[in-house]
């Protein structure tokens, strides 16, 4: 593909060169025209390129999302280059080839110009002398007009006579004045090729040669000294060109020995005179001025008759033979000499004008293109370095994000397990401590001091205060046993969480973690609710004789079985005999098998049933005992029994009732509290779990904020990298475009500025 592109470029270049050579062969002046068109096109492209570069640099400089990749100085430099290129483009658009004709008065300067233009454009001949500088250039219009110096007024000059009359009537014109003669291009083809012809007054009529040179000669590409072949070069003519040579480096000077047709009258002296003129002119150009080599001097000195050439060309333009009329001998030779001068002049001025008008600007354009290319290369490198840095930062943040996610997952699993272990340990500690406190409940109840009275109203208040005392005492004792250890364990776990998650947070947040994570003073709430728990407690503070029938049965059988025995019924349910044993390896139990307790209940129940059936049973038993021990022992027993009854009855005071009440309450409360041991342990473990989970949740919230910040930074980095990548592409494109413009300038230099080999 690159080979094909290279071949295409080569073909295009060859075609351009061929077209260029064809134009040059057609007219040497086309060389300047094509060069001007080419350089103007290059500067137009250069201006558009610098405008694009300036806009790009300014937008990049003002992009707040980017770190600086260009400087304000670079932006101002490129804007300065833009103004310079625009100024040069305006100058190039006005550039043209300029030839200045100088010589003594009436040497035929205007006639030479008219002969070159194939028409009587400037007044010449007898009675007409040029009294100011005349600048002849083409115009696209169809009417000729004059422009005087310092005025935009167009003065009509349709014919040479009108022009001559206008010039002589204007009294303000002096030798140093400039009048522009704008002549239609359609009438003079030579003017189409950006050629300006400068006619001048005779250099022998003024002493203001220095001001003439400064004003009219510094931008001239070729100087033509029109000399009179009937005399030698005058010192005035030499002096003027010495001054020109001092102000300009190696000016292009042609010497026309005009009126050479006069030599035809003396043919025997023609060659001798020609040789003398050639030697003197060559010596002047080579030895005195040093503007050409001796080998090149022959191409700068010509012997012509401008009047003959002008007349011949006017006749040819009118359709008549150019050799018609009375012509001196040797006309064709002099015509050929004039044509040879024109050819050499055109070649010289086109080469010289291209070099003097375009070379400096071409060099400046190359410098500007190179400067902008270096700026674009600098921007490209800065953007590339910043992109690499952003990619490293993005990768670092991505790694950080992955580390946080992985570490958070591991820590969550670890802390979940540890929280479970701590809650189980808390439940075990609370359950153990509560069981021990229940066993010591009687001590706590005995510590309760309040006036006791068996009336229902006082008992209700007594119970409520006892409930409060029990709940506060149990809570205090449980707190002394468990809270300190549990709180220490919880705080240790919280600190471990903070230490574990702190590395996942930014450095700026780590020092503020204690303020970001709320850590309130934790205390266990045991929530025993003794008033509700013991709401069904029913005290029994009525007097009961210790050896009474009810108390004895209650003592031996317990409250439940004594009630069954005293009520006189048997609620025993006969066990059915299964058809098949539940366990084939074990034989079925016999139907009459009873436990020892059931056997005792059955005996006493039977006895009670017997005594309840008939009062005769008492007499029978009493008679049996009477016969066995005697009446004295029976009387003594009844006496002691009665004394014991009286004693217990007398000692059944309010204090005794209070002790009975507290004993009954301890038994009832112990039974109820045993039922809530598991619940209380679970409740405390749940409180610890909630506290630890809340701490971990707050820490995770801070980690989530860090993750969100990292994700936002990664997204910003991605956007920034995308912008930087676009900047690099644009900067690279503009850098390469500068290289392309440089190659265009090099091609222009090779085609138009380097001398042909």
From Swiss-Prot:
Residues 93-342 form the Dynamin-type G domain. Changing residue 230 to A: Loss of function in promoting mitochondrial fusion. Pfam families: Dynamin_N (PF00350), Fzo_mitofusin (PF04799). Residues 258-261 are annotated as: G4 motif. Changing residue 111 to E: Interacts with PRKN in absence of PINK1. Residues 103-110 are annotated as: G1 motif. GTP binds at residues 106-111, 258-261, 305, 307. Changing residue 665 to S: In CMT2A2A; uncertain significance. The modification Phosphoserine is found at residue 442. Its EC number is 3.6.5.-. It catalyses: GTP + H2O = GDP + phosphate + H(+). It is found in: Mitochondrion outer membrane. It comes from the Eukaryota. Residues 626 are mitochondrial intermembrane. Ubiquitous; expressed at low level. Highly expressed in heart and kidney. Changing residue 69 to F: In CMT2A2A; uncertain significance. Changing residue 744 to M: In CMT2A2A; uncertain significance; requires 2 nucleotide substitutions. Changing residue 276 to H: In CMT2A2A; uncertain significance. Mitochondrial outer membrane GTPase that mediates mitochondrial clustering and fusion. Mitochondria are highly dynamic organelles, and their morphology is determined by the equilibrium between mitochondrial fusion and fission events. Overexpression induces the formation of mitochondrial networks. Membrane clustering requires GTPase activity and may involve a major rearrangement of the coiled coil domains. Plays a central role in mitochondrial metabolism and may be associated with obesity and/or apoptosis processes. It is linked to Charcot-Marie-Tooth disease, axonal, type 2A2B: An axonal form of Charcot-Marie-Tooth disease, a disorder of the peripheral nervous system, characterized by progressive weakness and atrophy, initially of the peroneal muscles and later of the distal muscles of the arms. Charcot-Marie-Tooth disease is classified in two main groups on the basis of electrophysiologic properties and histopathology: primary peripheral demyelinating neuropathies (designated CMT1 when they are dominantly inherited) and primary peripheral axonal neuropathies (CMT2). This is Mitofusin-2.
């Amino acid at each position: 593909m690159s080979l094909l592109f290279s071949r295409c470029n080569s073909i295009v270049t060859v075609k351009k060169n061929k077209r260029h050579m064809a134009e040059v062969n057609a007219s040497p002046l086309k060389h300047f025209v094509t060069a001007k068109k080419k350089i103007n096109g290059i500067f137009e492209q250069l201006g558009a390129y610098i405008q694009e570069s300036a806009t790009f640099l300014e937008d990049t400089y003002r992009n707040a999302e980017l770190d600086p990749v260009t400087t304000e100085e670079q932006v101002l430099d490129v804007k300065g280059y833009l103004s310079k290129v625009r100024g040069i483009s305006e100058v190039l658009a006005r550039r043209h080839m300029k030839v200045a004709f100088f010589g003594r008065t009436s040497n035929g300067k205007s006639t030479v110009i008219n002969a070159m233009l194939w028409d009587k454009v400037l007044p010449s001949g007898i009675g007409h002398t040029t009294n100011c500088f005349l600048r002849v250039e083409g115009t696209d219009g169809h009417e000729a007009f004059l422009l005087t110096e310092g005025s935009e007024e167009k003065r009509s000059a349709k014919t040479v006579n009108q022009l001559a009359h206008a010039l002589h009537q204007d009294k303000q014109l002096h030798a140093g004045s400039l009048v522009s003669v704008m002549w239609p291009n359609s009438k003079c083809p030579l003017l189409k090729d950006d050629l300006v012809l400068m006619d001048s007054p005779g250099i022998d009529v003024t002493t203001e040669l220095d001001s003439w040179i400064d004003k009219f000669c510094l931008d001239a590409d070729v100087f033509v000294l029109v000399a009179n072949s009937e005399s030698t070069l005058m010192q005035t003519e030499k002096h003027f060109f010495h001054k020109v040579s001092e102000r300009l480096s190696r000016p292009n000077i042609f010497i026309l020995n005009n009126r050479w047709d006069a030599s035809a009258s003396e043919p025997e002296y023609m060659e001798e005179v020609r040789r003398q003129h050639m030697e003197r002119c060559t010596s002047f150009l080579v030895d005195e001025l040093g503007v050409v080599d001796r080998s090149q001097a022959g191409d700068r000195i010509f012997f012509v008759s401008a009047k003959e050439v002008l007349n011949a060309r006017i006749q040819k333009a009118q359709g008549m033979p150019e050799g018609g009329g009375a012509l001196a001998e040797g006309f064709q030779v002099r015509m050929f000499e004039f044509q040879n001068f024109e050819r050499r002049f055109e070649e010289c001025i086109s080469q010289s004008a291209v070099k003097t008008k375009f070379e400096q600007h071409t060099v400046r354009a190359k410098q500007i293109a190179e400067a902008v290319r270096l700026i674009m290369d600098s921007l490209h490198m800065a953007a590339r370095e910043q992109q690499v840095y952003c990619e490293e930062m993005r990768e670092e943040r991505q790694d950080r994000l992955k580390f946080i996610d992985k570490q958070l997952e591991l820590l969550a699993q670890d802390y979940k397990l540890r929280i479970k272990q701590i809650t189980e340990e808390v439940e075990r500690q609370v359950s153990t401590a509560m069981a021990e406190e229940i066993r010591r409940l009687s001590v706590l109840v005995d510590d309760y001091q309040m006036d006791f009275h068996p009336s229902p109203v006082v008992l209700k208040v007594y119970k409520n205060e006892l409930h409060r005392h029990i709940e506060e005492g149990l809570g205090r004792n449980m707190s002394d046993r468990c809270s300190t250890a549990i709180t220490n364990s919880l705080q240790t776990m919280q600190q471990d969480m903070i230490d574990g998650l702190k590395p996942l947070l930014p450095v700026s947040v780590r020092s503020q973690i204690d303020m970001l994570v709320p850590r309130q003073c934790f205390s266990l709430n045991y929530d025993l609710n003794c008033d509700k728990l013991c709401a069904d407690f029913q005290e029994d503070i009525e007097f009961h004789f210790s050896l009474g029938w009810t108390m004895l049965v209650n003592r031996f059988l317990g409250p439940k079985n004594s009630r069954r025995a005293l009520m006189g019924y048997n609620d025993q349910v006969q066990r059915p005999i299964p058809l098949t044993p539940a366990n084939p390896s074990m034989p079925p139990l016999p139907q009459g098998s009873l436990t020892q307790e059931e056997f005792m209940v059955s005996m006493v129940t039977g006895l009670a049933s017997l005594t309840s059936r008939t009062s005769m049973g008492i007499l029978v038993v009493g008679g049996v005992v009477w016969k066995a021990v005697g009446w004295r022992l029976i009387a003594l027993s009844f006496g002691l029994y009665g004394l014991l009854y009286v004693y217990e009855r007398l000692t059944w005071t309010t204090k005794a009732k209070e002790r009975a009440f507290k004993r009954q309450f301890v038994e009832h409360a112990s039974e109820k509290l045993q039922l809530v041991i598991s619940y209380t342990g679970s409740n405390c473990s749940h409180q610890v779990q909630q506290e630890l989970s809340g701490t971990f949740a707050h820490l995770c919230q801070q980690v989530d904020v860090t993750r969100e910040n990292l994700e936002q930074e990664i997204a910003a980095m991605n956007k920034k990298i995308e912008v930087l990548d676009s900047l690099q592409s644009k900067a690279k494109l503009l850098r390469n475009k500068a290289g392309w413009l440089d190659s265009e300038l090099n091609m222009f230099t090779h085609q138009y500025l380097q001398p042909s080999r």
